């Protein structure tokens, strides 16, 4: 059995009769992109800007190919990531040692304590919590996610009226959903759930980068509606993946993440074959379906095709996604 099929088999249960129709991937991607940048899908049906769009994509390709030009699209990966991840991947890590490292960052400390307080609130424990105990309460996976959220969130922040700024909130919202789903799917495939979480969170850095690249081409005067065209969106997605690979790969976040960045950057998310790549691709689909679900409708059984085939942890992850 091919590797991709084996991975899928680990995540899916026995097939059941379809009850929810699914848009073809190009249609879903188009609708999702319109949601991402705040353009009504029906408004994006106008003819594209022709030669200008071709020039825009060509100049984005020049940015992708230039290490110097790429460098300005995203902040550099903070040095704290490799050090903390190395500590957390060691099963012998001391909660006191980790707490000492975390205490040097006020924002990270607040995030860890907030997560631990949330966990304790579900039970009867009303004891006051300090940082060392918070580290013990949320465990390794909780720590990894808290660190990733705090350290990586600034990558997605943007202000102003640019294309990347108007999409920033949606990009982060989708990244958080995709990270949670990818963690669940990766765990079902026998992978470290955190590798899935990190993959889901960081893949959307490609969206931020490609939209910032487009923002830099102000002289072309091409607006969101022209870019959100059925013929153009697939080209933007391909460049999103290329930038993800080119920017995240050098951060050296671990062997699997390095290989994923190279794979996605080379062949695109739709064509990946590695187990982690397949987990990310499936999470990307589910997160997009969640974004496009009717307002107030969070039931996967009513909005996700082949819902009953998903493993229970994946269903639970989907059900726990925020609005």
Summary of predicted features, one role per range:
Residues 1-202, 207-216, 227-323:
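Conserved alpha-helical "signature site"
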Residues 220-222:
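Catalytic or ion-translocation cores adjacent to nucleophile or general acid/base/metal-coordination motifs
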């Amino acid at each position: 059995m091919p590797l991709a099929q084996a991975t899928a088999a680990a995540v899916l249960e026995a097939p059941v009769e379809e009850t929810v129709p699914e848009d073809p991937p190009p249609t879903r991607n188009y609708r999702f992109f319109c949601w991402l940048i705040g353009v009504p899908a029906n408004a994006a049906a106008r003819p594209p800007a022709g030669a200008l769009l071709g020039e825009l994509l060509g100049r984005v390709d020049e940015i992708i190919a230039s290490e110097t030009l790429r460098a300005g699209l995203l902040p550099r990966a903070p040095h704290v990531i490799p050090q903390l991840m190395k500590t957390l991947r060691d099963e012998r890590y001391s909660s006191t040692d980790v707490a000492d490292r975390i205490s040097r960052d006020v924002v990270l400390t607040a995030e860890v304590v907030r997560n631990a307080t949330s966990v304790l609130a579900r039970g009867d424990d009303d004891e006051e919590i300090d940082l060392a105990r918070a580290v013990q309460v949320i465990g390794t996976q909780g720590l990894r996610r808290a660190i990733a959220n705090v350290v990586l969130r600034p990558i997605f922040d943007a202000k102003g009226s640019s294309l990347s700024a108007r999409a920033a909130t949606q990009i982060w919202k989708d990244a958080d959903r995709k990270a949670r789903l990818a963690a669940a799917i990766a765990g079902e495939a026998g992978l470290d759930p955190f590798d899935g979480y990190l993959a889901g969170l960081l893949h959307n850095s490609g969206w931020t980068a490609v939209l910032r690249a487009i923002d830099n081409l102000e002289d072309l005067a091409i607006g969101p509606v022209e870019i959100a065209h059925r013929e153009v969106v697939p080209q933007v997605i391909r460049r999103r993946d290329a930038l993800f690979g080119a920017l995240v790969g050098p951060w050296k976040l671990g062997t699997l993440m390095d290989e994923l960045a190279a794979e996605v950057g080379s062949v695109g998310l739709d064509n990946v074959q590695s187990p982690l790549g397949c987990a990310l691709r499936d999470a990307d689909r589910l997160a997009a379906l969640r974004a496009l679900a009717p307002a107030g409708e969070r039931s996967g059984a009513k909005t996700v095709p082949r819902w009953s085939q998903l493993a229970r942890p994946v269903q639970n992850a989907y059900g726990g996604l925020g609005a």
